[in-house]
């Protein structure tokens, strides 16, 4: 897995995913975004929170697309994390690093998967959604 990240895909564009997107863009990283709610993805694109939108999940696992992505970040609700990871099984053990932002991991059991790094960036706010995106949300915070 390369340490040079140039293109990322964020799945889930609420406060956490959008904050990661904004922070990444400030570092010159190209950000692709997907959300189950097409309106959210469209707003994120219009507000320049993401550089490119992914309209359908099927495109994510398309080899022509995913092989150009360095890092996939899941910023979905905890109960959806495992389901999304399973949908990404075609890229398990590839050169693409997959991580998440979920606070709950006890239901996630993956054996012999070398490119999934579970994480919890202990961050949040009393606000939610795309409108609460903050590129400085993760500064000086602990990540476990």
Feature names for model-found ranges:
Residues 142-144:
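Conserved small/polar residues in nucleotide/adenosyl-binding loops
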Residues 8, 72, 98:
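Receiver (REC) domain switch-region micro-motif
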Residues 62-89:
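Rossmann-like NAD(P)-binding element
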Residues 65, 136-137:
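Structural alpha-helical scaffold elements that stabilize or flank donor/cofactor-binding regions
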Residues 4-7, 95, 140:
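Phosphate-coordination loops involved in phosphoryl transfer and adenosine-cofactor binding
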Residues 51, 70, 96:
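Conserved acidic residues
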Residues 1-57, 61-64:
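NAD(P)+-binding Rossmann beta1-loop-alpha1 motif at the extreme N-terminus of oxidoreductases
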Residues 82-131:
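Rossmann-like NAD(P)(H) cofactor-binding subdomain of soluble oxidoreductases
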């Amino acid at each position: 897995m390369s340490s040079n990240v140039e293109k990322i895909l964020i799945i889930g564009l609420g406060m956490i995913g959008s904050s990661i997107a904004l922070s990444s863009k400030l570092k010159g990283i190209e950000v692709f975004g997907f959300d189950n709610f097409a309106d959210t993805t469209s707003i994120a694109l219009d507000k320049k929170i993401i550089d490119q939108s992914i309209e359908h999940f099927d495109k994510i696992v398309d080899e022509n697309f995913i092989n150009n992505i360095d890092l996939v970040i899941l910023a979905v609700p905890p109960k959806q994390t495992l389901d999304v990871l399973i949908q990404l099984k075609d890229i398990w053990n590839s050169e693409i690093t997959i991580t998440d932002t979920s606070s709950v991991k006890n239901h996630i059991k993956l054996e012999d998967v070398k490119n999934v790094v579970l994480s919890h960036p202990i961050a949040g706010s009393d606000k939610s959604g795309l409108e609460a995106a903050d590129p400085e949300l993760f500064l000086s915070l602990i990540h476990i």
